[in-house]
Amino acid sequence: MAVAVGRPSNEELRNLSLSGHVGFDSLPDQLVNKSTSQGFCFNILCVGETGIGKSTLMDTLFNTKFESDPATHNEPGVRLKARSYELQESNVRLKLTIVDTVGFGDQINKDDSYKPIVEYIDAQFEAYLQEELKIKRSLFNYHDTRIHACLYFIAPTGHSLKSLDLVTMKKLDSKVNIIPIIAKADTIAKNELHKFKSKIMSELVSNGVQIYQFPTDEETVAEINATMSVHLPFAVVGSTEEVKIGNKMAKARQYPWGVVQVENENHCDFVKLREMLIRVNMEDLREQTHTRHYELYRRCKLEEMGFKDTDPDSKPFSLQETYEAKRNEFLGELQKKEEEMRQMFVMRVKEKEAELKEAEKELHEKFDLLKRTHQEEKKKVEDKKKELEEEVNNFQKKKAAAQLLQSQAQQSGAQQTKKDKDKKN
């Protein structure tokens, strides 16, 4: 029996003053210390065509050299390759995972290029959900692999988005925080770049693609996020090479016509991307992944399993009520299955009995047939035996008669010989 427990409303809360220092003002410091000791994780998905500069931009963003294999255009399909790294800046540790889409856009038929990406994102959500559903959970030590940010690299065509880009972003926008960027922006003239940006944003809106919105509800970041949002998609240039500019060395790309400085905001939007992705909104990206994208996946999965927050009449359902309903449903299904199996067993037994009776009948018929055949054969043998015995008797009689005649003939011959001798004498 469920017992309703009342919750205090905001009107019931009273503000009280303290007569002395208690110490809970140290809670923010406690949280910071705990988070610092645990470290942080951040997972970036880089989606873009082969050779568009994904690896170079990652190296430039984090000011290090990550491992990367030379890319080819001969991949039979799209595959995702994830690599994790431990980074440390001051006393803050970051477990960074970079996921690359190898072979994206290289196939002739690109209709299903987005599927491996969607499957990978869902697989990370599923792994986290399975950990959450365990009786003994260990989320504290769990390596969270859910994607927090998707950097979508757009080829610098200067015209419009490719259909592959629109389809892929539309499939991903409900699963991940998409940040569109124009790669190799130094290949487009400035006036064309502004038009290209406007065209991209217009196409995203008209096709209903939801990209990541920089938060503007917090005072500390509202102004900078509002300012930076107008520059989307960020036009970036990546480079790990340093070029001497004046008396300083700076990351740049050297061309015959001049130098493109990576961190010069007049040349590209790299600094804006770094500010928005890492320095200002990294925690919001992590939070949005958990509270929005993962929650959507989790809700859909639980609904598939039969767990819902409301009943058919839209009345709230408690977890206990849901459990009882699922338990009763399961027991009903179990009883139904048991009855079906019982009936199936009875039917099989009857079928087997009928088969055995039929086999027994056939055996009796075969036995009777063999018995009759045996009797007939026995009678034939006995008749044949009688015939043989009669033939033997007849033969014996004939033999005796022949012997008698032979004996009489011999006696008659002896008497005749004697008479002949007597006459001569």
Swiss-Prot record:
Xref: PANTHER family: SEPTIN
Family: Belongs to the TRAFAC class TrmE-Era-EngA-EngB-Septin-like GTPase superfamily. Septin GTPase family.
Region entry G3 motif, spans: 100-103
Subunit text: Septins polymerize into heterooligomeric protein complexes that form filaments, and can associate with cellular membranes, actin filaments and microtubules. Forms homooligomers. GTPase activity is required for filament formation. Interacts with SEPTIN7, SEPTIN9 and SEPTIN12.
Residue positions where Phosphoserine is found in the record: 9
Region feature G1 motif, mapped onto this chain: 48-55
Function: Filament-forming cytoskeletal GTPase. May play a role in cytokinesis (Potential). May play a role in the cytoarchitecture of neurons, including dendritic arborization and dendritic spines, and in GABAergic synaptic connectivity.
Location of the region described as Disordered in the Swiss-Prot/TrEMBL record: 399-425
Stretches assigned to the Septin-type G domain: 38-304
InterPro entries: G_SEPTIN_dom, P-loop_NTPase, Septin
GO cellular component assignments: axon; cell division site; dendritic spine; microtubule cytoskeleton; septin complex; septin ring
Protein residues bound to GTP: 48-55, 103, 184-192, 238, 253
Sections of the chain in a coiled coil: 320-410
Biased composition (Low complexity): 401-416
Protein name: Septin-11
Organism, as annotated: Bos taurus
Chain positions found as N-acetylalanine: 2
